[in-house]
Design a protein with these regions (language model features):
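Conserved acidic donor-binding segment of nucleotide-sugar-dependent glycosyltransferases
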Residues: 415, 419-427, 436-441
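Non-catalytic membrane-proximal stalk/linker segments that position and tether the catalytic domains
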Residues: 20, 24-120, 479-494
Length: 494
């Protein structure tokens, strides 16, 4: 390198070091226009110094498109630091949008069960765990499989489902929530929508799935346009910690019922409430009383032990159970059920302190509990409900029942079939009903007999199948979609 070149190199090195602090100082004293002129002069000087000071490689293609360079030049009149000098342009590199293969992988993982299997019916459910609604899912899926309907069950939550093994062997299961657990909610919705649109199934049944209800609300019209018949099951409203009504029927149904081909429930009372408060057409509504266990048998009862079998959660009012047990020290209360996290503190400790209460944890089969033969009756204390399956199982086992008049319970339990107390009954009223049931064995036996007759007549498998076939378009060989079947709207007899 010549002497002139070496001098220019030293000057360029000095300029690189001194330029930032000088520019910072000048920003405090110069106007924007003066500062802009200084930067332009420095850029020209830098180009002259570096021309011989460094070996410039052959120019490479510009990473930035020309229109961006032009905009930077225009913006430099306002902010001189944005001027697209050669040095500034060299720091830019090519950029490509990141590719997220997650949705594509989820879609590909579900293709076999949605497309290749070619199901006739798709069930969208949150999980299959121990519970009445989950048992209802099993009833619906079993009925479809029994009638030759090809079924795909889509589990939309990322949770363990211990009851998956109860599904018929020929049913396909997609654990959608677990497969897509790394995706965002919108990606999961869009992948599921694409699968449902491309799936040959004409019927879709939503049962308690948050993701499915969101999909119905946002894309129900699209699914309808593609010829999908969408059915949804609702059982009761929920109540939050402030006793405010919530749940799928409150949050989604008023905005999405128009996309449904049918609204199903296990009780008639709740459907009437929805019709009265939201104005949903009664011809859209269908109630199907769930069947009792196929292996139901009456089991002789003895003693004075009271069975309480429910999930220990705020809905089931374990605090009320505590007050009832406190008021009836002469009776033993055996409590079976998984403890909700909300009740693992003081509520659980209070129950353990009572000498006439025994906590046994969760159970898998009510019939297995009843076969022990040591229970005199079932106590049910739910705050809100549909038509609880446990009442059917207890009746099948020959147990008398004391329960509150909430949800659809009065459709099964009344003064002829059990001991019904008011929805707002306190511990004293429950205690009086329990004493009446256990203190009058002849009358109690008569009511149990009537309850079992009702169970046989209305809650058999054939009755469930016949009711499902009356839902327009739901099952092959049933009522055609163009035929109307209206829900009777007179009050339920109690």
């Amino acid at each position: 390198m010549s002497l002139n070149g070496r001098l220019k190199a030293r000057a360029a090195s000095f300029a690189r070091t001194a330029y930032p602090p000088i520019l910072g100082s000048l920003r405090r004293v110069l106007s924007e226009r003066q500062l802009q002129r200084f930067i332009l002069v420095c850029d020209r000087l830098k180009g002259w110094l570096l021309k011989e000071a460094v070996v410039v490689p052959s120019p490479s293609p510009m990473a930035l498109p020309p229109w961006i360079v032009d905009e930077m030049k225009a913006l430099a009149r306002i902010e001189p630091a944005l001027y697209p000098s050669a040095a500034k342009l060299r720091v830019f590199t090519s950029w490509k949008a990141p590719i997220d293969n997650g949705p594509a992988q989820l879609y590909r993982g579900c293709l076999a069960d949605f497309i290749e299997y070619a199901p006739d019916m798709v069930f969208l459910v949150p999980h299959l765990q121990r519970g009445g609604a989950d048992l209802g899912i099993l009833h619906h899926v079993r009925l479809c499989a029994e009638m030759g309907v090809k079924v795909t069950v889509v589990v939309t939550r990322d949770v363990v489902s211990p009851w998956l093994n109860r599904l018929p062997a020929e049913v396909r299961v997609v654990e959608f929530g677990r497969l897509g657990n790394l995706l965002g909610e919108e990606d999961r919705r869009l992948v599921l929508l694409r699968l449902l649109l491309q799936c040959p199934a004409r019927s879709i049944h939503i049962i308690n799935s948050q993701l499915a209800w969101e999909l119905l609300e946002r894309h129900g019209k699209t699914l309808m346009f593609e010829g999908k018949r969408i059915y949804a099951s609702v059982f009761c409203d929920d109540l939050d910690g402030n006793a405010i009504r919530c749940g799928y029927a409150s949050e989604f149904l008023p905005r999405s019922w128009m996309h449904l081909a049918g609204l199903l429930s296990d009780n008639r009372t709740f459907l009437q409430q929805i019709h009265e408060r939201d104005g949903i057409p009664p011809e859209l509504m269908h109630w199907l009383y769930f069947p009792a266990s196929d292996h139901a048998e009456a089991i002789p009862t003895a003693g004075s032990t009271i069975l309480w079998a429910s999930r220990i959660s705020p809905q089931k009012r374990p605090g009320l159970l505590y007050e009832i047990a406190l008021a009836l020290p002469e009776y033993l209360f055996e409590v079976h059920g998984e403890v909700d996290p909300a009740c693992r503190g003081e509520t659980q400790r209070k129950l353990r302190r009572l000498p006439n209460v025994r906590l046994h944890g969760r159970y898998d089969s009510f019939q297995a509990l009843a076969r022990q033969g040591r229970y005199a009756m079932l106590l049910y204390t739910s705050r809100y409900d549909g038509l609880p399956n446990i009442l059917l199982e207890a009746t099948a086992a020959g147990l008398p029942i004391v329960a509150p008049d909430v949800g659809g319970i009065a459709e099964f339990l009344n003064t002829e079939t059990g001991y019904l107390v008011g929805a707002d009954a306190d511990a004293g009223e429950f205690a009086r009903a329990i004493r009446s049931a256990l203190g009058n064995p002849v009358e109690t036996a008569r009511r149990v007999k009537r309850a079992r007759e009702l169970l046989t007549r209305r809650h058999g498998w054939a009755a469930f199948r016949d009711a499902a076939r009356k839902i327009p378009g739901y099952l092959p060989g049933g009522v055609r979609p163009e035929q109307e079947v209206s829900m009777e709207t007179e009050p339920v007899s109690r």
